[in-house]
Amino acid sequence: MQKFDAGRPQMTGFGRKQGVCDWNLDGHHDHALASRVYAFGFFHRTIQIVGLTSLPGGKMNSSKFLTGRGRERLTLEEQTLLEDSSSNVQAVKARETLVRRGKPVCSSMLVTEGFVCRSASKHRGQRQMVSLHIPGDFVDLDGFKLKRLDNDVVSIGPAKVTVYSHDTLASLSERCSRLAESFWLSSLLDAAIHRAWIFRLGRLEAEERVAHLFCELHARLEMVGLAQNASFGLPLTQSDLGAALSLTGVHINRVLRSLRERGLLTFQSRQVKIHDRKALAKLGDFDPAYLYAAT
């Protein structure tokens, strides 16, 4: 497996130096050659050659981006443009640091599979998870302009991320105003979720925090088709939950047992089953309005 380096664009298959997107977005004028490159790239995606950006079954890596957001979801043309412009798709191992705090970055990542978190830590090693990203989320669009992050980006379990160089994001934004708006919207949605996380830590008690987080994750995963019948996979450990909710592992264990005994929720073997959605939402004071789902 190629070592992941978020500080530079990843280039395998059709990368930034030889891909379709360069001919269309970066000012080259040999349109005949561009057409041949595009056709060749389309052929390879169709037969799913390893190293290109289509998923098995012909699904696009960006297919979940803004899914569930109604009219804000990308058109097929916009989605195809975004798909053709990705630098690379990277498979990453569990607990792999994808971006280190303070290090220069020149690319951003869209989660394709799995879960990725952003975390901050003290010098003594205490860790706080400050966000959790699911398939369809851009993890670090703020790095597009800031050029470094004030937190680490870490995969929770095995995951796949689609890498976009910042040059490509700039070209896409210039070429397609709707894509520029979608990147902005993605950042606004992140900010809304961050505010909800601040509220959760600042005003909710332990059981309420756990209930609120599980309600949020269920709602977000349901929007992208990854939660069915109030059940979903979640590779978080009790230690991870503690890092996200500022609770000890012992406290998390106690709360999960209480929720299970009250018939609200079961979390075991990395699977979540919500038995009473209405009661769990009431316990966590959960209002999904901040997720801006399609109505």
Question: Would you name each region that the model predicts?
Answer:
Residues 131-196:
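Cyclic-nucleotide recognition modules
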Residues 6, 30-32, 39:
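Short hydrophobic alpha-helical segments enriched in small aliphatic residues
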